[in-house]
UniProtKB/Swiss-Prot annotation:
EC number: 2.3.2.-
A GO molecular-function annotation: acyltransferase activity
Keywords of the record: Acyltransferase, Transferase
Catalysed conversion reaction: N(8)-citryl-spermidine + 3,4-dihydroxybenzoyl-[aryl-carrier protein] = N(1)-(3,4-dihydroxybenzoyl)-N(8)-citryl-spermidine + holo-[aryl-carrier protein] + H(+); N(8),N'(8)-citryl-bis(spermidine) + 3,4-dihydroxybenzoyl-[aryl-carrier protein] = N(1)-(3,4-dihydroxybenzoyl)-N(8),N'(8)-citryl-bis(spermidine) + holo-[aryl-carrier protein] + H(+); N(1)-(3,4-dihydroxybenzoyl)-N(8),N'(8)-citryl-bis(spermidine) + 3,4-dihydroxybenzoyl-[aryl-carrier protein] = petrobactin + holo-[aryl-carrier protein] + H(+)
Function: Involved in the biosynthesis of petrobactin, a catecholate siderophore that functions in both iron acquisition and virulence. Transfers the activated 3,4-dihydroxybenzoate (3,4-DHBA) moiety from 3,4-DHBA-loaded AsbD to different receipient molecules, including N-citryl-spermidine, N8,N'8-citryl-bis(spermidine) and N1-(3,4-dihydroxybenzoyl)-N8,N'8-citryl-bis(spermidine). Also catalyzes the transfer of the activated 3,4-DHBA moiety from 3,4-DHBA-loaded AsbD to spermidine to generate DHB-spermidine (DHB-SP).
Annotated metabolic or biological route of this protein: Siderophore biosynthesis; petrobactin biosynthesis
Annotated protein name in UniProt: Petrobactin synthase
Lineage: superkingdom: Bacteria
């Protein structure tokens, strides 16, 4: 359960909590099931773009856990300047500092690129080793850690068409209060809206009907990044597990809702496959079944949200009663 990884930057933040304390990091995954994405001018649904920023995560990481996230990457400066800053941070890193950098995973063939994206912007953590020519790479999202050649890592930063980086100095990690956790849940919870599913549906319809300048052939590129976005839905499992710890409901019930989450994730894989097939074969007759599948996925996710909100309210009431008893 604790090994679910769904978002590279959030996973880095949670890994720091996990390695430096016994504090529960799972609330930080709240709302990630509806995480930001972008649709480019060409109609590509993208998990990363210059239009997406992570300010929300930085703000709430400090609110919940008391740790300030410092953005060292300056988008106003050129790549060489930012690489120089990165080098200084790594080479002068105190023991309690975590240096997070965005690499292009497609430039690291030694590492598995399971989503087959190129470029593949991805956040992970870097530190020095006893060997000058090797760095230690900690990649929580892919559950990978080990030594890499320093020059290869630098190349994956330098030649990354995107860029980004943060550092966190860990002094003390605070345990979020139940009130803070509740505030974060409420802040991120979109009860009636599954934006990714609906935007994907609208885009596929437009491309199939070749509306607004779109072409059916554009669907292949349009849905390529869907698997990277789909795994964010696994963050529901973190939330269910977190509330179950207090509510103590059966494992059978927990598994039922995890299976519904899996239905959605696999549904995205199914839709991606069918959309690509429709584009490759020019068979617009497939559109109806694709739309029906997306509507089915939307209905399942709304059921998940209804149940999750019910559990949240029960959890909140129990926590409120606990605090009254303590008082």
């Amino acid at each position: 359960m604790t090994s679910i990884k769904v978002h590279c930057l959030v996973s880095c933040f949670c890994e720091i909590i996990k390695r430096r304390s016994d504090i529960d990091f799972r609330p930080f995954y709240f709302g990630l099931w509806d995480g930001d994405f972008d649709i480019t001018e060409g109609g590509i649904i993208s998990y990363h773009s210059e239009n997406i920023n992570h300010d929300h995560y930085l703000l709430w990481y400090e609110k919940l856990y008391g740790m300030k996230v410092n953005e060292w990457y300056d988008h106003a400066k050129d790549k060489d300047s930012n690489v120089e800053t990165f080098l200084q941070l790594v080479e002068n890193k105190p023991e309690n500092r975590y240096v997070i950098v965005m690499v292009d995973m497609s430039l690291l063939p030694e590492r598995e690129n399971k989503f087959h994206q190129k470029p593949f912007p991805h956040y992970l953590m870097i530190s020095e080793t006893e060997k000058e020519e090797e760095w230690f790479m900690l990649d929580p999202d892919f559950r990978w850690e080990g030594n890499m050649e320093r020059e290869k890592v630098l190349y994956s930063v330098q030649d990354n068409p995107f860029g980004g980086g943060y550092f966190i100095d860990v002094e003390e990690i605070q345990e979020p209060t139940a009130e803070m956790v509740a505030s974060y849940f409420i802040e991120t919870f979109k009860r009636n809206d599954n934006e990714l599913t609906m935007e994907l549906k609208n885009l596929i319809i437009k491309m199939a009907n070749e509306e607004e300048g779109y072409l059916l052939s554009g669907l292949v590129a349009a849905v390529k990044q869907i698997p990277v976005l789909a795994i964010r839905k696994y963050s529901y499992e973190h939330a269910f597990a977190y509330f179950r710890e207090t509510l103590q409901y059966s494992e059978q019930e927990f598994d039922y809702w995890c299976d519904r989450v899996e239905d959605i994730v696999q549904g995205f894989t199914n839709v991606q496959y069918r959309a690509i097939k429709m584009a490759m074969t020019n068979n617009k007759g497939m559109l109806l079944s694709i739309v029906e599948k997306l509507d089915e996925m939307n209905a399942i996710e709304l059921q998940i949200k209804t149940e999750l909100e019910r559990q949240f309210l029960s959890w909140k009431e129990m926590k409120s009663n606990e605090s009254v008893l303590v008082f």
